[in-house]
């Protein structure tokens, strides 16, 4: 099956170009960005729990093992495997516990992933955050990379804040300044996020991070 990518096009890009000269320059330098999405809500939640506090490469290694072992990643296959087998795939006990707890809620009808589709962004973040192991940042990433919501802009994402510092030459991004950019990019914050992530990852080599270096400890 071919990969699915976050959907955006000239409508979103034209809006962002008109709203912000610097972001316009970034968009023109980088071009179109293909970011894969996972439209399966259950598997997306599991994938994001696996990825917490580890590298993307490590996340994909564990995820691939899980798919090879379980076949379809579903509430039934997760619960049939159990915590010890999930741990054997390379995840921590805590993550295995979170994933099986989530699977149990889905199986028992206490959590309906498909109901998220009809919720507002705030409602969906709140519902996802009620799950063990899911915080606001993880919930926002699920909204962006699974539900493909167009207006997600996560203050808790360190790379987004780094990208803002690099593009706009800020030393620090506090909540008030962050919200100013959210208002500027809305209703297409998700597309803006893709470009800020790219900048933070080094897509434009001459751009640097203006965050002050921490003073060295005295010996």
Regions found by a protein language model. Give the residues of each.
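Flexible, active-site-adjacent loop/turn segments at secondary-structure boundaries
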Residues: 31-33, 40-43, 52, 89, ...
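A general alpha-helix detector
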Residues: 44-49, 81-85, 123-127, 141, ...
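Short, amphipathic alpha-helical segments that act as regulatory/interfacial helices
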Residues: 46, 63, 100-103, 196, ...
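C-terminal accessory module of base-excision DNA glycosylases/AP lyases that mediates lesion recognition
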Residues: 1-33, 97, 136-219
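Alpha-helical ds-nucleic-acid-binding substructure associated with the helix-hairpin-helix region
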Residues: 22-26, 54-55, 59-132, 184-186
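A positional/architectural concept
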Residues: 11-71
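Alpha-helix N-cap and coil->helix boundary residues
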Residues: 37, 57, 61, 73, ...
